[in-house]
């Protein structure tokens, strides 16, 4: 009559002192993802998940909120201390997001531009007439 022990289903907190922060900016939204060195996603945040909707998601303030939330989660849950930053996209709030991550206390080792530039590839959409 041995008792069966229950295993805890709680996730163990992993310590992640070094990581990669991906900043993906577009004209409509900013998405910030924190990964480990291998590329496994640890946490993420976006302007939409920070509580903003519609036109406000495309502002620099929205990117600032998203970056602060992602950095806070990374420090709190994984004790992230230093990170590479990879930036993708043409959005308006790239520097704001980087500055907010730096202000949160994460040491930035590398800042790399990863945006793709077409060599006159696809035809752009027609101009809007309002």
Swiss-Prot record:
Subunit-level organization: Part of the 30S ribosomal subunit.
Keywords, sorted A to Z: Chloroplast, Plastid, Ribonucleoprotein, Ribosomal protein, RNA-binding, rRNA-binding
Annotated localization: Plastid, Chloroplast
Membrane-crossing segments per the record: none
Entry's Gene Ontology cellular component terms: chloroplast; ribonucleoprotein complex; ribosome
Protein name: Small ribosomal subunit protein uS11c
Xref: Pfam families: Ribosomal_S11
Family matches, as Gene3D superfamilies: Ribosomal protein S11
Family label: Belongs to the universal ribosomal protein uS11 family.
Record GO terms (molecular function): rRNA binding; structural constituent of ribosome
Organism annotation: Oedogonium cardiacum
Superkingdom of origin organism: Eukaryota
GO biological process entries: translation
């Amino acid at each position: 009559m041995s008792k069966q022990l229950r295993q805890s289903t709680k996730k163990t907190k992993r310590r992640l002192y070094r990581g990669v922060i991906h900043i993906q900016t577009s004209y409509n939204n900013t998405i910030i993802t924190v990964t480990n060195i291998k590329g496994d996603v640890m946490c993420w945040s976006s302007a939409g998940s920070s509580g903003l909707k519609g036109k406000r998601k495309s502002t620099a303030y929205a990117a600032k909120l998203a970056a602060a939330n992602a950095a806070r989660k990374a420090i709190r849950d994984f004790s992230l201390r230093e990170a590479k930053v990879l930036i993708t996209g043409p959005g308006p709030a790239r520097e704001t997001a980087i500055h907010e991550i730096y202000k949160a206390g994460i040491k930035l080792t590398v800042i790399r531009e990863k945006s793709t530039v077409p060599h006159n590839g696809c035809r752009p959409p027609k101009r809007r007439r309002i």
